[in-house]
Design a protein with these regions (language model features):
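Active-site-proximal helix-loop-helix substrate-binding element of RNase H-like nuclease domains
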Residues: 25-28, 36-140
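Long, highly charged low-complexity segments
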Residues: 1-24, 48-56
Length: 140
């Protein structure tokens, strides 16, 4: 099975004013994880339940190819919070870099979608990120 996934995390603001969402920063945590049609909250201001880790691991266990944009970041978080996945991965950002054949183009997901003519939903988080509001505080 081919699966697509993305994580949203908290972040810290560095002394230089940059965002640090690293899973190795002990003050950061996983806010939510989306895989295929499932979206699971882990730690969010508006979420009071218990995250359904089993549904995520069951999908990962059936997955033969995991697809994501800048997937190294998402995989580090996946492993950091205790999920297992050892199958193949495809990174759309690296794929886009290779397809550019040395032409310098932005590699953000938004830029890649615009260049390829992919219709994208409006980015509801863009202003929050500009304002340095972490994902756990963005309304569900």
């Amino acid at each position: 099975m081919i699966s697509t996934f993305d994580v949203e995390t908290s972040f810290q603001i560095t002394e230089e004013g940059k965002l640090d969402p690293s899973p190795k920063n002990p003050d950061n945590f996983l806010v939510s994880l989306g895989i295929n049609d499932e979206y699971v909250f882990f730690k969010h201001r508006d979420f009071k339940g218990i995250p359904n880790r089993k549904v995520i691991q069951d999908i990962l266990d059936k997955t033969t190819l995991l697809v994501g944009h800048n997937i190294k970041f998402d995989l580090l978080w996946l492993w950091e919070v205790g999920f297992t996945y050892t199958g193949r991965v495809y990174d759309t950002m690296i794929g886009e870099y290779v397809m550019n054949k040395g032409i310098k183009r932005p590699l953000s997901l938004k830029a890649c979608c615009q260049f390829r003519g992919v219709i994208q939903k409006s980015d509801l988080t863009e202003q929050y990120m500009k304002d340095k509001v972490s994902f756990q505080y963005i309304p569900i």
